[in-house]
Structures are given as C-alpha cells and as structure tokens.
A protein has these predicted regions:
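Structured, active/binding-site neighborhoods that engage oxygen-rich ligands
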Residues: 1-292
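C-terminal output/interaction extensions
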Residues: 403, 408-428
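Intrinsic-disorder/low-complexity, polar/charged segments enriched in Ser/Thr/Lys/Arg/Asp/Glu/Gln
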Residues: 299-305, 331, 358, 372-374, ...
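Hydrophobic beta-sheet segments that form the core/acyl-binding groove
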Residues: 361-398
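Catalytic strand-loop segment that frames the active site of acyl-thioester-processing enzymes
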Residues: 294-328
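Hydrophobic beta-strand-centered segment that forms part of the acyl-chain substrate-binding groove
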Residues: 341-374
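Short coil/turn motifs at secondary-structure junctions
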Residues: 313, 341, 380-384, 396-400, ...
Length: 428
C-alpha cells in the first residue's frame, strides 16, 4: 500500500506539469506533494478486503461500500467525473470504464491473496464494481499479478514474461523510446504497461517511482502503479520516503495504513518489518511461482504431433481442391495446424487458445485413401510478448515425407476472440 501512496504523492505535482529534466533531478517531495484519489481508493480497497476477504460476493459489496464511504469523506481528492458521479449518487452499478483507476487502487489485492489465480480473481472483482470494461479489468489484473509475483520472489524477467503473455502488453519497449511521443493517457491500455516498464527499468524503489514520473502523462497514477510493484519487489519502502508520506496523510488515513499492515501480519502472516534499502541489487533467485511461469509459457523447442488415416472426407476430390483421390492440400495444412496446437496446448490457460495466421508449405507427394499420416510441429520462435508463435511443420505418410514448411499462430483470449468474430458476423 505505501508503495502506491508514495508514488501518488511524488507524482501529484507533475500530473499536468511534466518534469522536463533528468529523472534523478526532481525533488521527490515538495510543498505541492499531496495524496489524491489514488491513495484514497487504495485505502478503500484495503478496507474492503479487511472486511470481507474470503467471501467474494460479500467482498464485492464491501468494495462498493468502502469506495462510497471514502469517496464522500475525501470528496476533493481529484476523482474522474464519471467516478465522482458514481460516488455521489450512491450507484452500485459499474459504468464500463477502462480508465486506469482500476489499476491505481488494486495494490492491496496483490498482498492479500494466496495464489496468482486468486489474486487475478480478486483484482477483477475490485475493478468490476466500476471499471467493468475488459481493458479496465485487465489493467487491474496485470498490476495485481505483477505485485503478487514480485512479492513471491519472481525476478524482473518472470514478471515481464508473464504479464506480456497473459495480458498482451508490450513490455519490450524502453522508457527512452516511449517518452518523446507520450502524452497524458488515463486509459489502462495506454498507461498500465508504461508504469510496469518504469518498474522494470528501475534498480531501486526510488528509481521505479522516478521513472514513472519522468515519463510524463498521468504521473501520479503511473507512479502509484510502479511504486506498488516496487514495494513488493524490494520487500518494503525506504524509511525516509515512508516517513515523508505518512506525514502528509491525515490521522484517519494514517490509521488505515497502520491497520492494513497489522491485518496483513495478523491475518495473512505477512510482515514488512524490513524497509527497503535505497538501492538493492536485482534478484537472481527465481521463486517457485516464477519457475512455474517460465516452465509453462510457450518457448522454442516445444513439439506436437497429430495422426490420422486418410478417409473420403480428406480427399481432394471430396473437398473441392482437386479432382484426384489423394490427401487434399487444405487437409494436410489442417493436420499441421492441429500438430502446432498440440505443441502449445498444455501451457495455455483455460481461457486462452491459439489461432492460425499464416502458412507457407510445400506439398511434395500424394497420399492415397486408407494410408496413415503423421503431422509434426516444432515451435521455433516466440514473439517478445509470448503470443506470436512460429512453427516448423512437416507431414509424413507410411512411405515418407509428404509436406513441410512454416506456420504462424497467435495466442488469444478465447471469449474475446469469439466475441469479435460474432461482431463481424453481424456486419451488414
């Protein structure tokens, strides 16, 4: 929580007045540094968890109640127009937002939960009470997942690889590449990846926060997100920054912060007695969760195969790709695709699948009806975000090779992909 609060305060003076100098040159705290809606709603999420963690429906209601309660108590914290209307009207219905408010407040979830899957589930729950757009939910889940992984001991590469693969964010860019054209962005898809990159490029808690502010844009929220991940990664926050942040909170919020860390210790068995050093070396050990992620994500060398017997329905004369009774080229391609699917199927989450995007093959020999055929695929390259897959594919009948080439696939969210396809089907 304190990582997000410090980031919020450090970034607050620069939200609409971007810092133009070097990242290490601006003062972390100044007379203009203050807490904003990022801090208030982070505390609200923590309160919701303390009241009802373990009962998901009750926790959803607790999130709503706490957001209303704290939103009204701190009505001038700088909320977005739609969220403020949601607060003052007492609405309990979401409004399809994909703003980064869902990600800025989610950090307590990354600490409260016992597993990565539970973390993502509760992150979605905390987001969906207002930000029920898929991008709003994704931003919260990606942030909370990064926090959980960092807290669990995963290194930067494991965090980058998982978030890139699971949520499709491009984390291969550098801040130096992003900054020249970057503007004030408040959507999850245009600010959460950048905040995560700010953390990834930092070599200390302070550097992570400075990076997020130096980038420009929605600096307080980006720094809150980067700071929340950095707190988990470095095992706490530097003592001087902790004291400076607490001094800028009122008595109620200071009490809430203390209550949260006490709850983590007493009810979740998590202690943060050690404050992070100003500079800490990059982690070299890989956590069990990190190892699991790296072992299950698609990686070059994975293989798959599929076998069948050439029957009437696979013949060129039957499918319309020719007039002879041999294995049709489209059916050979289908077999190669099936083998490629089998190569990566075991490592994909249940809600994800792969779809073919390109084939470049040679059909070298005819295979008559009744003959057995075997299709093989080997994953030869994976894109930076883990979703673009290139395979070497081959086909064999009982005599020998009958086809070879390359095949490309992309990993997609099954439900979202199907929804887009149905939308195209309604086009007139």
């Amino acid at each position: 929580m304190l990582g997000a609060i410090i980031g919020d305060m450090v970034g607050s003076p620069y939200e609409f007045h971007p810092w133009q100098g070097a990242a290490e040159a601006f003062p972390l705290f100044s007379p203009c540094s203050r807490f904003t809606d990022d801090t208030v709603m982070t505390v609200a999420v923590a309160r919701g968890l303390m009241r009802a963690y373990g009962q998901e429906q009750a926790c959803r209601e607790a999130f709503i109640d706490a957001m209303h309660e704290y939103g009204r108590a701190y009505s001038r914290a700088g909320y977005g127009q739609r969220f403020f209307r949601w607060i003052v009207t007492g609405s309990r219905e979401p409004y399809n937002s994909f703003g980064n408010g869902s990600a800025m407040r989610v950090s307590p979830v990354g600490w409260a939960c016992d597993s990565l899957e539970e973390t993502e589930r509760y992150a979605a729950l905390s987001a969906s009470v207002t930000h029920d757009h898929p991008e709003g939910i994704k931003g919260a889940c990606a942030t909370a997942a990064a926090i959980f992984l960092a807290r669990d001991g995963a290194g930067r590469d494991a965090i980058r690889d998982y978030v890139s693969f699971r949520y499709g964010y491009d984390l291969a860019r550098s801040l130096a590449e992003i900054r020249p054209a970057y503007r004030h962005k408040e959507s999850c898809q245009e600010s959460v990846p950048e905040a995560i990159i700010a953390f990834l490029e930092g070599r200390s808690f302070e550097e992570a926060v400075r990076n997020a502010v130096w980038l420009g844009g929605d600096s307080d929220t980006q720094a809150a997100i980067a700071g929340s991940i950095a707190e988990a990664f470095y095992g706490g926050v530097p003592q001087d920054l902790r004291e400076a942040a607490l001094a800028r909170l009122d008595d109620r919020l200071r009490g809430d912060v203390a209550a949260w860390y006490h709850w983590l210790s007493e009810h979740r068995g998590i202690r943060l007695d050690r404050k992070a050093d100003p500079v800490q070396e990059q982690k070299t050990a890989v956590s069990a969760t990190g190892r699991d992620i790296m072992e299950t994500m698609p990686k070059a060398g994975m293989t798959g195969q599929w076998e069948t017997t050439v029957e009437e329905g696979l013949l060129a004369a039957q499918v319309g790709s020719g007039e002879v009774r041999v294995l049709a080229t489209p059916m050979m391609i289908m077999g190669m695709e099936r083998a490629a699917m089998e190569a990566v199927r075991p490592c994909l989450p249940e809600d994800m699948t792969s779809v073919g995007t390109r084939v470049d093959i040679s059909h070298m020999a005819p295979t008559p009806c009744g003959m057995k055929v075997r299709f093989e695929a080997k994953l030869t390259a994976v894109s930076a975000n883990g979703r673009g897959l290139t395979f070497a594919v081959a086909a064999y009948d009982e005599v020998g090779p009958i086809g070879e080439g390359t095949h490309e696939r992309v990993v997609v969210d099954r439900e979202k992909f199907q929804s887009r396809a149905q939308t195209r089907g309604k086009h007139e």
